[in-house]
Amino acid sequence: VSQDLVLSTMGRGFWILYNLLPLHEVSDEVAGSEVHLYEVRNPYRLYAARRFRDPGPDEPQYPNPGARVDYYLASEPSGEVRLEILNANGDVVRAFSSEQANSAIQFSDSIRMGNWSLAGAGTPQLPKTAGMHRFAWDLRHAGPWSQSLQQSGGNGPMVVPGLYQARLSVGSWSQVVSFEVLMDPRIEEEGTVTVANVQAQVKLSLDVRNALSDARLAVAKLDEAQANS
């Protein structure tokens, strides 16, 4: 059912194995590829439900909302594996890498973030071992910059519904697949919130993020200047 595997336990309940889309794409060509990026199922723009406890061993493990990006590596590459999420204008919204984040804080001459890219800030590391991998993007922009690597880039605003691309790069090889982030159908049915409303909300959130990043950078540079004086 919609690339999910649904199992019935003879009247006692249903179990669903989520998103088997890669199995529907298997072919001799895919199996013989050194690297392959699978199609991405269109995700819904949903907020994760709050959990007050971990599920028990017999309880279902519900996936968090987001886009699942599946890719295959026939062997572990020697260089970087990079995944970029692009919007309809071709701008990089989020970037993920197999390389470890640099622990050193690099300051620019400017007191403002300026053209600094937050797209890769605070992102989890991409796996690059041989085999199949499923990576989950939470549909969020990067959050505000922080001098702490553990906090930098976290909890950013969710992206606007619309068309996006996932671009996987390994060395000189790259592949792009398109997908659409869909509006929460419950919100669409109510009709009280439009895409234009969401766009305005996200723009304001990004403006606040950038202002907070500028403020934190200014404080960090003042601390650096004081330490070197």
Where are these regions (language model features)?
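Repeat-solenoid scaffold signature
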Residues: 1-29, 72-74, 80
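Extracytoplasmic/secretory ectodomains and luminal regions
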Residues: 27-229
